Structures are given as C-alpha cells and as structure tokens.
C-alpha cells in the first residue's frame, strides 16, 4: 500500500461514474480494503447547477449533501479528486463562473486535506473533432447547447488555463489527462484504459500498486445504487447515505 490514506473524496461526472468500480478497486489496492469512498458524480453532472439527463435531475456538486456528511464524519487522512469539469462549458456557463465553482470546491476540500488532485481538460482529443464530429457529439451529449465549435474550443482553452492556474495557486496536484486514454469519443476514457487512468489519478504516475480487478458484477451493482438526492421526472427518489459496506471491501457514499 502506498500510504495511510483512509478516505477518498471524488468529484466528477461521467468518467467518474463509468469508472467508479475501477476507481474503488484501485483505492482498495492502494489504500487497503477498509478505504472509504465518498463520490459526488453522475452523468452530465454540473459543479454548480442542477443538471438533467433523460428525465433524471441531480443537484450541482456544490449543492449536494457531500459537504454536510464530510463535516459530520470524523476526520481521516483523505485524498481528494476534482475532475470532469468540462460539462458546464456545454451547459453555457461562462469560464469565469465555472472556475469560481471549481475554486469553491477546491477550497472546501482544502479545509479537510492538503492532498487534492485536479485533472485538466482533454484538449488534444477534443480539438481533433472535425466540425461534423463536434456537431454529432454536441447533439448527442448536450442537445440544448448552441455553442459553435470555435466558441466551445475558446472556452475549453480558457477553463483549462484557469484550472492550471488554480492548481498552482492552491498547491493542488495537477494531472494532465493522457490523449491515449481517449478514442472516437473525445471526452470519456476508453474502458481498456480505466485501470491505467485511475491508477494515475488516485495514486500518481510512476507509482506501483496492485492492478485493479474489473468486476462486471460489482460494476453493475454500483450502477444500481441511488445517490442521496435525485429526481426522476420531477419526483424525488434519493437514498439516505450511511456508507454502504461493499462485498469486495470498502465503504461507499454517493451524492
């Protein structure tokens, strides 16, 4: 095991949601089978506003119950992750607003731990998009968005520069995302690279930990678990979070 980290707090959206089982497995290998994982995630998640996909609505990460729970829990040696910042660009929020939300999230985490990692944006894979592919992915993932390709790319550059500056000013560990983790889809890690990606995000480049074991059964079960608060077609359908004990080890809170 690489350290005495007892708790992982992860903020993100689709990549965190798709890779949650690999992330937890990586945390077990790096930090032990009793590791606690608290995640504020979800497809299309926004850092500061409610987001809706296919009739399901989640509060912004800053408005989630994660922060109340972190205040309630006894302090533990914590590693925190900030990732998947790009959704808010396609929701139409300004770079200034997005960076203010991420800065607020970082400051809340820094009140709990100095061990905070932030990822940048996948500039290389995004900027490979032709006008036709940009329109396809914009329509697929963000149907209401009307930003042009050039407007979106300019905002991506501005937000990415702001993330780098935030990492420097707050002494966060900045993790540049590897272009090789992406394929046809420019914003989601390829499943074949989930293990490598989560090892670097959670443990760091060059660190050697037991390889994460992908479990389809655990992946499926984790994706059936409800977060603390969500709405389906306007009806609230969340679940109070007590820290679920996972069969393969660890405890999980979802927000």
Predicted regions mapped to residue ranges:
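Alpha-helical cap/lid subdomain in secreted, periplasmic
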Residues: 60-192, 196-200, 204-212, 243-255
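N-terminal secretory targeting modules
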Residues: 1-42, 135-143, 208-255
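Conserved SGNH/GDSL esterase-like catalytic core that processes O-acyl groups on lipids
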Residues: 2-100
């Amino acid at each position: 095991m690489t350290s005495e980290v007892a708790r992982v707090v992860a903020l993100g959206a689709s990549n965190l949601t798709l890779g949650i089982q690999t992330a937890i497995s990586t945390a077990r290998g790096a930090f032990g089978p009793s590791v606690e994982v608290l995640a504020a995630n979800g497809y299309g998640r926004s850092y500061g506003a409610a987001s809706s996909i296919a009739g399901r609505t989640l509060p912004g990460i800053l408005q989630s119950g994660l922060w109340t729970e972190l205040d309630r829990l006894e302090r533990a040696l914590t590693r925190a992750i900030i990732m998947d910042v790009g959704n808010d660009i396609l929701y139409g929020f300004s770079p200034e607003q997005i960076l203010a939300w991420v800065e607020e999230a970082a400051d809340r985490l820094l009140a709990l731990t100095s061990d905070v990692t932030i990822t940048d944006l996948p500039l290389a894979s995004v900027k490979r998009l032709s006008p036709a592919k940009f329109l396809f992915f914009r329509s697929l993932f963000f149907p209401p968005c009307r930003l042009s390709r050039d407007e979106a790319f300019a905002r991506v550059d501005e937000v990415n520069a702001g993330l780098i500056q935030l990492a420097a000013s707050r002494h966060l560990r900045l993790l540049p995302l590897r272009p090789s983790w992406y394929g046809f889809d420019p914003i989601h890690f390829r499943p074949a690279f989930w293990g490598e990606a989560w090892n670097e995000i959670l443990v760091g480049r060059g660190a050697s930990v037991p390889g994460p074991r992908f479990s389809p059964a655990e992946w499926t079960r984790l994706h059936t678990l409800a977060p603390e608060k969500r709405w389906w077609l306007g009806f609230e359908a969340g679940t109070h979070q007590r820290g679920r004990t996972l069969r393969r080890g660890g405890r999980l809170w979802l927000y």
